[in-house]
Amino acid sequence: MDKDEFSRQARDATQSLYRVACAYLASPPDRDDAVQEALLRAWEKRRTLREEQYFKTWLTRILIRV
């Protein structure tokens, strides 16, 4: 997955990530930090994603583990 494709898919998933973060974290700054950390980890591990069609699911799992 190249930089542009990652950026596009991450942008498309951002609203969903914030909804998940709201379910796990009460503090808005903590939510922001968790989403940002998940995006950073996803970028660093992007080569481990086996099928791009599951990007959003994969990214959500990363967020939950942050």
Residue spans of the language-model regions?
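A short, charge-rich alpha-helical start-of-domain segment used by transcription regulators
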Residues: M1-R19, A23, P29-D32, W43
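Short alpha-helix-to-loop micro-motif enriched in aromatics/charged/Gly
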Residues: R47-E51
